[in-house]
A protein has these predicted regions:
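A conserved beta-strand-loop-helix scaffold within acyl/acetyltransferase catalytic domains
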Residues: 23-28, 38-175, 189
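Active-site/acyl-donor-binding loops of N-acyltransferases
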Residues: 38-67, 197-266
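Aromatic (often tryptophan-rich) hydrophobic motifs at membrane interfaces
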Residues: 4-6, 127-239, 244
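Conserved GNAT acetyl-CoA-binding A-motif
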Residues: 11-25, 190-202
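Short catalytic/ligand-binding loop motif for oxyanion handling, primarily in non-cytosolic enzymes
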Residues: 27-31, 206-208
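Anion (oxyanion) recognition and catalysis
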Residues: 12, 37, 88, 191-192, ...
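Acidic, aromatic-enriched beta-alpha/helix-loop junctions
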Residues: 1-12
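Charged, often glycine-rich, active-site loop that binds/positions anionic groups
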Residues: 32-36
Length: 266
């Protein structure tokens, strides 16, 4: 209540139209759902595509509290263990990068966006994030083959959790499975930091083998993680008319963006 009352005062001061919160609360928490509803929040819990919201509603989370590397690795799916080992045998190496390595990461990220059909933030965004968070709360890991960067990831670490935030993979040497090795390295970082949870982040809420994002679901599931559904987006409308107009414009923007990305892929 203190949060919502304070937010209302700020909304009035700065002419805000809505307060949005996407809490780390599971969807089956009935008590929390009842509390926020009584406070006046509306719950948007219909997003199935993890790109529909700012924070993904469906994720895979790996409980690593009190576990050893061996225990975690043995709990991987057999194919996942094979691919992690394969990456090492094929000559993949992983190194922790620095701010300068963001240039290689971003170049590969653009390649990934073109292949998978999503828009990419500018290099400056990642540089500013690095300046604000690294090295304590953010790292850049790059996978190399024959001295050439072929894949990269950005994990962030806060409190008792480590999150896989961004990933990029080149169209070349994908058969060398660098993404499996990078996930394993991030899990080991989470263990070193005494994290309780390693969060592999978003997947589709549609669990169907024919769904275009099912491959991502299987990839993350292979690390022994638990499929987790959050409560969704909470929003409190301070100016319902303005917010409705905003949502209409947002829908139009997303449709135009999707058309542009599909055209670019062709």
């Amino acid at each position: 209540k203190q949060l919502t009352d304070g937010a209302k005062e700020l909304a009035k001061k700065y002419h805000a139209m809505v307060l949005k919160i996407e809490p780390d609360i599971k969807s089956d928490d009935k008590e929390f759902r009842e509390i926020v509803t009584k406070l006046g929040f509306k719950i948007k819990d219909d997003a199935k595509d993890f790109r529909d919201e700012i924070q993904p509603r469906y994720v895979f989370r790996l409980d690593i509290k009190g576990k050893t590397e061996d225990e975690i690795f043995k709990a991987f799916h057999s194919k996942t263990r094979y691919n992690v080992r394969l990456a090492g045998r094929q000559g993949d190496t992983v190194k922790e990068g620095n701010r300068e390595d963001l240039k290689d990461f971003h170049r590969i990220m653009i390649e990934t966006g073109k292949r998978d059909g999503f828009m990419i933030r500018p290099l400056e965004y990642f540089e500013q994030m690095y300046d604000a968070l690294a090295p304590e709360h953010m790292k850049v890991l790059m996978a190399y083959y024959d001295g050439k960067p072929i894949s990269g990831v950005i994990p962030i670490m806060y409190g008792n959790k480590t999150w896989y935030l961004y990933g990029a993979s080149s169209n070349e040497h994908r058969n060398l499975m660098p993404n499996y090795l990078l996930q394993w390295e991030m899990i080991k970082i989470a263990l070193d930091r005494k994290s309780d949870i390693y969060d592999l982040r978003g997947v589709s809420g549609v669990v169907d083998e024919n769904h275009p994002q099912y491959g991502l679901y299987r990839f993350k599931q292979g690390f022994g993680a638990e499929f987790t559904e959050f409560i969704g987006e909470l929003h409190m409308d301070y100016s319902p008319v303005r917010y409705k107009l905003y949502k209409i414009s947002e829908t139009v923007f997303k449709r135009v963006r999707s058309l542009l990305m599909n055209r670019h892929k062709k």
